[in-house]
Amino acid sequence: MSSYSQLFAQHLDTLQQRTRDILQQQGLSGLAIHSGQTHRIFLDDQDYPFKVNPQFKAWLPVLDNPHCWLLVDGVNKPVLLFYRPVDFWHKVAELPNAFWVDFFDIRFLTRPEQVADHLPANKQEWAYLGGHLEVAELLGLGQPNPEAVLNYLHYHRAYKTAYELECLRDANRIGVRGHIAAKDSFMAGASEFEINLAYMKAVGQGANEAPYGNIVAINRNAAILHYTHLSAQRVPDAERYSFLIDAGVDVHGYASDITRTWAWRRGEFADLIAALDAQQQEIIEEIKPGRRYSELHLQMHHRLARLLQATELVDMSVDEMIHTGVTNVFFPHGLGHFLGLQVHDAGGFMQDERGTHLSAPEQFPYLRCTRVMEVGQVFTIEPGLYFIDSLLEPLRLGEQGKRVNWNKVEALRPYGGIRIEDNVVLHANGVENLTRQAGL
């Protein structure tokens, strides 16, 4: 048995235990988990790229096959209903042959409606987990997406199994390879479009396999937080200032989410990247079990305020910068989020398995995690420092604008901004930085 198989066996045991617990709590007999269905483009005969239900891929890495089902009760061997139609128009999924196949009772469907032949007699006592409620109703499944079940599963998804951690390590190893190729491509004078091609070639995944749309931003485009335009226009060397890439990789359904920023030449912006990089590594060292993630985010704002002071961008005290929202202008997003089956993984606001919600602080509305940090959790840590026109203009017109060095801000605007993002695991004996240990 391979090491991956051994890790997967333990992973499945954990999922079975969680399933037993929530079924007992809710008086249910089982979960019918639907991989999903394709969505037809309006007034067209083509479908959008298929994206699998994350509740389905938690159990096994079947990521590209709609109309599959899992029937799980936490006790018996999980039943996988695997869709293999007779179809000469499209590629049919290969027969399962991977490290996970022995852990499932695999049955085949040639038509989606054949799932009805495999449902248990007491299907009214089974919950449906999936995005097609009309299918659940048609099949007579009892409860569609019960909130108590989803809350329980989402809360516990924050605690990664050894198998999940190995998938995330591999996603970082491969992702780092792509980031290095992207940097080399930028330094060779490539366009955003060409850089993205270099990244995808290095990691061996196309746009449909990637966990999210790659952000490949040259110069001012780095000030657009979710920039995915991918300009094919090459920028002349004399007008080339900076490059930000935020891109990940999918391994068995688990995502890496990595960001780096590079300067075209030495100078003040390169020094600013180095300074923020140092602050990012130091804030990672402050991750401890029992500390709330929102406290870490606030501490990062203190660090950023001191950096704004040291670089003479803002002439205010640290507390004043934070209290008046000046640091939010330069760092408007959250410090990070849970990472796993989804890039912004589930459970970031849940305080218990019942789903008790703790919103982001009013001062930091875009923070995606308010959980207490615990062993086994995986986060991104991604501080930023940006020069965003739509945020800088209100600051310039306000009272605090008098304390900003606008000459320096104007000199840095063409660079867009900086983001540095690592993926980290909290262990009992410290933090494992999956990204740095992969060589980036």
From Swiss-Prot:
Give the enzyme's EC designation. Answer: 3.4.13.9
GO biological process annotation, one example: proteolysis
Kindly state one GO CC term assigned in the UniProt record.
cytosol
The free-text function statement in the UniProt record for this protein reads: Splits dipeptides with a prolyl residue in the C-terminal position.
- Protein name (Swiss-Prot/TrEMBL): Xaa-Pro dipeptidase
Show the catalytic activity.
Xaa-L-Pro dipeptide + H2O = an L-alpha-amino acid + L-proline
Q: Where does Mn(2+) 2 bind?
A: D246, D257, E421
| Domain of life according to the entry | Bacteria
Q: Which family does it belong to?
A: Belongs to the peptidase M24B family. Bacterial-type prolidase subfamily.
Specify the taxonomic lineage.
Bacteria, Pseudomonadati, Pseudomonadota, Gammaproteobacteria, Aeromonadales
- Positions that bind Mn(2+) 1: D257, H337, E382, E421
Q: Which PANTHER family match?
A: XAA-PRO AMINOPEPTIDASE 3 (PTHR43226), XAA-PRO DIPEPTIDASE (PTHR43226:SF8)
| EC category name | hydrolase
The note on the cofactor says: Binds 2 manganese ions per subunit.
Q: Which UniProt keywords apply?
A: Dipeptidase, Hydrolase, Manganese, Metal-binding, Metalloprotease, Protease
One family from Pfam that matches here is: Peptidase_M24
What Gene Ontology molecular function terms does this protein carry? Answer: aminopeptidase activity; metal ion binding; metalloexopeptidase activity; phosphoric triester hydrolase activity; proline dipeptidase activity
The protein's required cofactors:
Mn(2+)
Q: Which gene encodes it?
A: pepQ
